Amino acid sequence: MASLMIQGCGSDVGKSTLVAGLCRLFVNRGLIVRPFKPQNMSNNAAVTEDGGEIGRAQALQAIACRTPPTVHMNPVLLKPQSDVGAQVVVRGKVVGAYQARAFQGLKPDLLATTVESYRLLAAEADLVLVEGAGSPAETNLRAGDIANMGFAHAADVPVALIGDIDRGHVIAALAGAHLVLDAADRERIKGFIINKFRGDPSLFDEGRREIVARTGWPDLGMAPWLASARALPAEDAVALERPVREDGGRRAKIVVPMLSRIANFDEFDPLRADPSLDFSFLPPGTPVPGDADLVILPGTKATLADLTFLRAQGWDIDILAHARRGGRVLGVCGGYQMLGRTVSDPEGVEGAPGSAPGLGLLDVETVLLGDKVLRATAGRLVGTDAAFSGYEMHIGRTTGQGAARPMLAFDGGAADGAVSADGRVAGAYVHGLFERGEARAALLAPLGVAASSGDHAAQVDAALDEIAAVLERSLDIEAIARIAGV
């Protein structure tokens, strides 16, 4: 089985982007490639064609491989619901919510599941590119590991270790990993890659030689800072803490409050990339700007908990004042639920049973009951000819008089969402409404904005090709291919 696992010296070192870029690179060379991540922790999820869910990063990597995503590409997905607990999704289906300690007891069975999914992918591919999680150097997590070295040994996959030079101390990170790993794990690593370098690469030649001397691992190259990676979805909310702003020429101001369990925030990437917008994620403790044109309440993994969090920031007061001034408000999924009169969880789906008043901007009520809805959707925005495509991923049913004025009309006749009588507040369950150019233009037209044309998916595809070309020039691809067994 030809394969390579990309592990990192920490979280957010660029593993997901490098795997996506390498997927596209080897696909462009004519290989059948499949992405794989044994265990992911993220509230950014994607719906597969068979109605399952996987990490959004693996869905992107499937795009890079020019193949539909499947649940086997990310067989274990952890979706945090609290600081110590998460919803566990196995091969696309929710199996329950577990505290961190209780989850440890599941790992032996889950390791077998991940290896089986990996082998199913390998059977249909020339190459499987595997992404680790966090860092193998977190040796306190080594026992029972299924995300990094535990999986690599069980599936017999060679490893390349990534160091992020943009953070600094990359020599210490790689040499330190070599120091703390046991002999078998060190031997599993067949080389290292420096990532996110800015400037003249020759300035770090001595640093790379020192890493080789201290670790004995071969140098597989140094990838530059990839500006085009900004067109790709971020996997973790930590990326939102470093917003990239490009002011100048933007007119409409759009803000998205960063809820504590914010989910699927990558759906706003088309807005972040639109030069006609002043778009930002609003950090906790920051008031909603008085000159905001549109406030978007995003999806969340825990609606009731984040409704409490929203009020703790004072955002409820700000949003209601914004609406009274004639500002526009849009709610997506959990954000849509918050805009209604009440949210109830009688069976404790998200935690302890309970209910809370919503913001009352839409005449609807939500009850968190029933099976999770996971499906791709398409249709038109009500009152326009603009077509949209997206996906639903939620628990709960929303009903009320406001639903008589739906926001979306699905192909086939059903409807979704609600719109206020004055048309300034709207919400729906569907994620991905800004992806298609015509839907984005229709949604932003009331703000007086001529949105950038074109589907965001085409921009992502072009970015993947650009990243692949850069990696072809900057990494030792022939050595990487030999290690992988291609």
From Swiss-Prot:
Annotated keywords: Cobalamin biosynthesis, Glutamine amidotransferase
GATase cobBQ-type domain span: 251-439
Pfam families: CbiA (PF01656), GATase_3 (PF07685)
Top-level taxon of origin: Bacteria
Gene Ontology BP terms: cobalamin biosynthetic process
Pathway: Cofactor biosynthesis; adenosylcobalamin biosynthesis
InterPro entries, A to Z: Class_I_gatase-like, CobQ/CobB/MinD/ParA_Nub-bd_dom, CobQ_GATase1, CobQ_N, CobQ_synth, GATase_3, P-loop_NTPase
Active site: C333 (nucleophile), H431
GO MF: ABC-type vitamin B12 transporter activity; catalytic activity
Entry function: Catalyzes amidations at positions B, D, E, and G on adenosylcobyrinic A,C-diamide. NH(2) groups are provided by glutamine, and one molecule of ATP is hydrogenolyzed for each amidation.
Family: Belongs to the CobB/CobQ family. CobQ subfamily.
HAMAP family: CobQ (MF_00028)
Name assigned to this protein: Cobyric acid synthase
Originating organism: Caulobacter sp. (strain K31)
